[in-house]
Curated annotation (Swiss-Prot):
Signal peptide: 1-19
Name by which UniProt lists this protein: LC-AMP precursor 3
Record propeptide residues: 20-56, 75-89, 115-129, 148-162, 181-195, 214-228, 247-261
Location relative to the cell: Secreted
Modification sites for Serine amide: S114
């Protein structure tokens, strides 16, 4: 009997100790729950002064980096030093040169195609010419605004411009020879119509030459007379070639004429699209 009571007392003591331990654990859990808000409750987020200052600093650094990237993308700093300003001007002049070269290529293609058969009405032809002139005027205005100055060309630049004019006239002569270098057999009415188109073509070439140079020619009396003489000689030579060529056989089939007209319309549509994209319309 004595040995039976001892284990019983030990069991009771163990049970009491376990109960106390469980009660203590429950109290600790309750305290933790009281200190920790529920996940379903909205907890306001408030930064300390140091954390707020750190976040503000990171934001300012981010904005400064964005400003730097924007300046690099635009190709200039907001306030340029002398060297940086010169570099930006050089990049702009290079862009203008590329733009002029692109326009010259477009004009050459237009000149080559305009030498073929056309069946545009007077209104459509005038409308296309007006759009082209407006586009060229817009390009000239953009170039003038971008450079921000009137062109004052030195002797070397003037010589370079004169060389470009001579190359342009040589190219026009080559195009005229290639265009007119085919057999023609025109009636009196068709011959008059072709002569009218040729005169319009020569007038257009003269206009394009003036627009290509992008400025009024201010040559000395001798240079002006020399340039005028070369232009008159070119026109006389072109008329002579035209007269010789118009006296020969030409027989284009209806399909070839339709094909040429289709290519011309496609080219004009492409020019209209490029002009619309450039002008931002």
């Amino acid at each position: 009997m004595k040995y039976t009571i001892i284990p019983f007392l030990l069991l009771v003591a163990l049970t009491c100790a376990t109960a106390r331990s469980i009660d203590g654990s429950e109290k600790e859990v309750q305290e933790i729950r009281e200190e920790t808000p529920s996940s379903n409750e909205d907890v306001p987020f408030s930064l300390s002064a140091n954390e707020d200052e750190e976040a503000r600093g990171r934001l300012q650094a981010f904005l400064a980096k964005m400003k730097e990237i924007a300046a690099q993308t635009l190709g200039r700093e907001e306030s340029l030093s002398a060297n940086e300003d010169e570099e930006a001007r050089g990049r702009m002049q290079e862009f203008i040169k590329k733009l002029k070269a692109y326009l010259r290529k477009m004009k050459e293609k237009f000149s080559q195609i305009s030498g073929r058969e056309e069946s545009f009405s007077a209104n459509e032809d005038e409308e296309e010419r007006g759009r082209l002139q407006a586009f060229l005027a817009k390009m000239k205005a953009i170039a003038a605004q971008t450079l921000g100055r009137e062109e004052s060309i030195s002797a070397n630049e003037d010589e370079e411009t004169r060389g470009r004019l001579q190359a342009f006239l040589a190219k026009m002569k080559e195009i005229a020879a290639q265009t007119l270098g085919r057999e023609e057999s025109l009636s009196a009415i068709e011959d008059e119509e072709a002569r009218g188109r040729l005169q319009a073509f020569l007038a257009k070439m003269k206009e394009i030459a003036a627009q290509t140079l992008g400025r009024e020619e201010s040559l000395s009396a001798n240079e002006d007379e020399e340039a005028r003489g070369r232009l008159q000689a070119f026109l006389a030579k072109t008329k002579e070639i035209a007269a010789q060529t118009l006296g020969r056989e030409e027989s284009l089939s209806a399909n070839e004429d339709e094909e040429a007209r289709g290519r011309l319309q496609a080219f004009l549509a492409k020019m209209k699209e490029i002009a619309a994209q450039t002008l931002g319309r």
